[in-house]
């Protein structure tokens, strides 16, 4: 019998559908709540060769994926795909390279460069997003130079290196 591991933090509707479809095909599912595991290469006993990474948390999912890859388990999506998808700027670069239509975008690291990038994109409005993160957190629609300066000043004061990377995207 085939066994597939499902790496998760929460079983949502999609995971329930995957589990149901696997049962119909006589595929054994091993549910692995990554929050409850000890990932140690010397002691971990793995009884599946393929895993689906379905964690809500990018950090937990990435670490679990890299662990299972290190012990020879094929993980879908693998860590290379995850590293592209977890960063909006990198994702946009890959999509553009593959000729997938995307809104114009730029990555800058200071207000002066942000102004130049926005001018090159055709002006306001734009959206500023953190390169890392999900669920629409910390994004801002910027309608003019005053809003741009205010948002970038706030990001600068927050102090986190992630807040000092400005992923700017054309508003569509």
Task: Give residue spans per PLM region.
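A residue-level signal for beta-strand positions that form part of recognition/binding surfaces
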Residues: 1, 125, 165
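ATP-binding N-terminal substructure of ATP-dependent carboxylate-amine bond-forming enzymes
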Residues: 1-81, 90
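A conserved helix-loop-beta module that forms one wall/lid of the active-site cleft
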Residues: 27-32, 68-138
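Solvent-exposed alpha-helices and their adjacent loops that cap or buttress functional pockets
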Residues: 44, 119-120, 131-133, 159-161, ...
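Short acidic active-site motifs
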Residues: 39-40, 113-117, 147
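Short catalytic-loop micro-motif centered on adjacent basic/acidic residues
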Residues: 5-6, 51-53, 77, 103-105, ...
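Short secondary-structure boundary segments
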Residues: 55, 130, 170
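Phosphate-binding site of ATP-dependent enzymes
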Residues: 140-172
């Amino acid at each position: 019998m085939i066994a597939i591991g499902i790496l998760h933090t929460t079983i949502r509707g999609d995971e329930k559908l995957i589990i149901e479809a696997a049962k119909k095909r006589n595929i054994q599912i091993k549910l692995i709540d990554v929050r409850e595991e000890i990932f140690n290469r010397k002691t971990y006993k793995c009884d599946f060769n393929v895993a689906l990474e379905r964690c809500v948390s990018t950090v937990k999912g990435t670490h679990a994926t890299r662990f299972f890859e290190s012990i020879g388990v094929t993980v879908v999506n693998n860590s290379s795909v995850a590293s592209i998808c977890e960063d909006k700027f990198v994702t946009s670069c890959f999509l553009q390279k593959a000729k997938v239509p995307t809104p114009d975008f730029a990555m800058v690291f200071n207000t002066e460069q942000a102004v130049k990038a926005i001018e090159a994109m055709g002006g306001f409005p734009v959206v500023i997003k953190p390169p890392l993160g999900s669920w629409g957190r910390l994004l801002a629609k910027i309608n003019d130079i005053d809003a741009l300066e205010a948002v970038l000043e706030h990001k600068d004061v927050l102090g986190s290196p992630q807040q000092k990377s400005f992923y700017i995207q054309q508003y569509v």
